[in-house]
């Protein structure tokens, strides 16, 4: 009988020692990507490695905005990468309005920055782009084909 209080005290001590205030830390989900953007003269695409909280289309669009590759925030309606490595990206109407207002060089640089950044981030082979579920049409081009990596110098 004398052992029972000692055993109970020992069990209580072990239980209290196992309790801590530390919370489980989630695994680091940050991703390192290469963001492409235009030089000041809209003549060449430049690139820079940046860290984003996690690899997602929304975080990639935010990184493009931060580097000045796009001039305003753009919503991502949908994103899918098929078995062949082609990304199917549907952006909000703000992207269509923004790129349609560009000149030829500005459009090339913005499209190149977008396409190259996504292809590089996801190691994809191509990108099919839509705006609000429709083919993107600007004054310079109709983007009804799979876009591939843009050369850094046009």
Task: Please provide the spans of the model-predicted regions.
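Bimodal "functional hotspot" detector
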Residues: 4-8, 18-154
């Amino acid at each position: 009988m004398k052992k029972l209080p000692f055993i109970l005290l020992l069990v209580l001590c072990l239980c209290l020692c196992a309790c801590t205030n530390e919370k489980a830390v989630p695994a680091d989900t940050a991703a390192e990507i290469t963001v492409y953007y235009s030089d000041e003269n809209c003549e060449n695409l430049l690139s820079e490695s940046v860290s984003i909280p996690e690899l997602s289309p929304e975080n990639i669009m935010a990184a493009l905005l931060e580097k000045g590759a796009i001039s305003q925030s753009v919503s991502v309606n949908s994103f899918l990468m098929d078995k062949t490595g082609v990304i199917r990206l549907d952006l909000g109407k703000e992207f269509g309005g923004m790129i349609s207002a560009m000149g030829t060089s500005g459009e090339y640089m913005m499209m190149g920055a977008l396409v190259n950044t996504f292809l590089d981030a996801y190691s994809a082979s191509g990108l099919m782009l839509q705006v609000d579920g429709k083919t993107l049409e600007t004054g310079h081009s109709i983007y009804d084909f799979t876009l591939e990596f843009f050369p850094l110098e046009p």
